[in-house]
Amino acid sequence: EKKRPDDNDDNDDEDRPERPERPEEPERPERPERPERPEEPEREEPEREPKCDDEMREKVKRRCDNENRRFDARRCECGEKKRPDDNDDNDDEDRPERPERPERPERPERPERPEEPEREEPEREPKCDEEMREKFKRRCDNENRRFDARRCECGEKKRPDDNDDEDRPERPERPERPERPEEPEREEPEREPKCDDEMREKVKRRCDNENRRFDARRCECGEKKRPDDNDDEDR
């Protein structure tokens, strides 16, 4: 352990407290024996390809020629039998041939596109300055036609209620809407006149002259008076 401040540097064993004796550890129980692993079957090692040097290559190639078989250089062995069109002196004949590609069916000819009609270019609107505007406006007035300021040209004929100086652009004609069934005319509620004291006295005198009752709510004369009505009744 580290020295304490009261330890002497030259006396290492002095004043060290005695360590208490460790109690005896109980005996550990014995571990159960592990079951033996079953023996694994031996793995068959893949056969290693023989080393194919030039000497081995020539030897195997001659044997393949004698057997009329193709020489497989990658495996350094004889492969399938030669075909009649194989070359005997071709060193690369041991490559496996690619299967012939099936011939592609001919594509059907595309139908010719119908010639598109030439697009008519929209007529450009003439430049409508003040001078041009006045010129067309005078001509339209002479022809009794309305002046279309947007197109800077004369439009439809004027109607009797058109103003001579009207030069607003014509609105495009809207498609006619289907006629709606005629609705019965709604009777507008009569507006009650303003019935102040002056109006009240005026209408009341007129009702008395006509021998009719005065309707104060509507500020007008109502039905004729009956004999039992009071002269001063103003309901």
UniProtKB/Swiss-Prot annotation:
GO cellular component, as recorded: extracellular region
Comp. bias intervals (Basic and acidic residues): 16-85, 95-133, 168-201
Compartments, record wording: Secreted
Principal location listed in the UniProt entry: secreted
Tissue specificity of this protein: Salivary gland.
Entry keywords, A to Z: Repeat, Secreted
Name of the protein: Balbiani ring protein 6
